[in-house]
Amino acid sequence: MIESLHSPHIARVKVLISSRGNKERGEHGQFIAEGLQCAREALAATSGPKIKTLFLTESGLSRIEGAGLDSASVETILVSEPVMAAMSSTITPQGILSVCEIGQNSFADLKLTGKSKFIYLHEIQDPGNAGTILRSADAMGIDAVITSPGSVDMYSPKVVRATAGSLWHIPLYSGITLSTLSEKFPSITKLALSAQGRTSLLELKDVGDCVAIFGNEARGIDTLIGGDVVAVNIPMKGNAESLNLSAAAAIVMFHLTAS
């Protein structure tokens, strides 16, 4: 068991969750996922990010064993509670911390089926929104989540935590420009959620291959609207002026996959 607070393992983890973690995660191709839920999904997944090293406290090991999870195939290191606290980005660690390898999804391999539904996040900055949208996309059966350059790092601790394990269920493609998406799929229907949209979401029926575009929380996506991008709005009967981005995205995804 590792008990020293000077262990190089702590430094290895801290650099991946630090304020400069985006750069480090990209260079090392690794990210941190904490908690039983993420460990369960990663150990069970046949695709997506794989666990490289699993750090456990004694209580964390009990949780893993109690959940019936088989961690024999990954490097497992026992650490003390103080060491886990030093590694963790949460106030109350669960005693389970996974160092995972970032999945290598190739955008070139993404195909259309005639009824494909994608989500495109344009310069989204809030990690909670990004993670929640990915989680909702998983729940609604969306086929892929695509992010633009300048969007929040989808492998940051806060985003990973907000996905609640859905990161292992849905293909993720990061750093893809809208023009690249359009060039690859020229026939795909592009919808942009906007308060100024003239088309009601409820008017959309059988859109076939479709990508729903959600923009920056503060600036929106008005600059993207035009050409072959259809601006849509969510009709609201109440008095609220607007919806939280993740709530609005969930409504759009539900309609697109249910209609």
Which residues does each PLM region occupy?
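Short, aromatic/basic amphipathic alpha-helical patches
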Residues: 62-73, 224-225
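RNA substrate-binding interface of SAM-dependent RNA methyltransferases
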Residues: 104-196
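Boundary-proximal intrinsically disordered activation/regulatory segments immediately upstream
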Residues: 1-63, 151-153
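Glycine/small-residue-rich loop that forms an oxyanion/phosphate-binding "nest" at active or ligand-binding sites
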Residues: 69, 73-99
